């Protein structure tokens, strides 16, 4: 698969999910020798826009988990504003130490319904948004290294034409 652009799309009210997405996008862009860009969905005005993604673009979508789910008040906005064209995707969820339950599967389902083709996914521990003590310092250097390895595995899979 010939990837021309890698786009990071994130909802990251506390900043950790943005770090996870940026690390992954930067590695994928390096591996594919592709340009990269970032789209924040943090504000209602960000989510009011419609975003269309081409088949030769790779989208890395990241979102935090709340009570084991994608944010229920904002997920409908994601479903409305993100549109693929058979676009490959990497699904990333972040959580603060309790559990991510079915959030990763939920994200893959959302992406698939919007004409994306999930090729890889992962759940990553980040500092809990309500406490500096839960998962303090996460994502750390080891987490960022794991993200780069995930990106390398995803790139290899995409080059070989695979999806989840």
Residue ranges: model-predicted function:
Residues 1-20, 25-44, 49-164:
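FMN-binding flavodoxin-like domain, especially the glycine-rich phosphate-binding loop
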């Amino acid at each position: 698969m010939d990837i021309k652009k890698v786009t990071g799309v994130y909802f990251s009210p506390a900043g950790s999910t943005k770090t996870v997405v940026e690390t992954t996008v930067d590695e994928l862009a390096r591996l594919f020798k592709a340009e990269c860009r970032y789209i924040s969905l943090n504000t209602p005005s960000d989510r009011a826009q419609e975003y269309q993604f081409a088949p030769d673009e790779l989208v890395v979508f990241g979102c935090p988990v709340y009570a084991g789910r994608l944010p229920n008040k904002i997920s409908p906005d994601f479903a409305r504003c993100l549109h693929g064209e058979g676009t490959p995707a990497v699904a990333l969820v972040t959580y603060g130490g309790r559990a991510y339950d079915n959030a990763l599967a939920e994200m893959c389902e959302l992406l698939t319904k919007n004409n994306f083709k999930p090729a890889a996914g992962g759940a990553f521990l980040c500092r809990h948004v309500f406490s500096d003590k839960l998962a303090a310092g996460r994502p750390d250097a080891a987490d960022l290294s794991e993200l780069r390895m995930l990106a390398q595995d995803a790139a290899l899979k995409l080059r070989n034409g695979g999806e989840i």
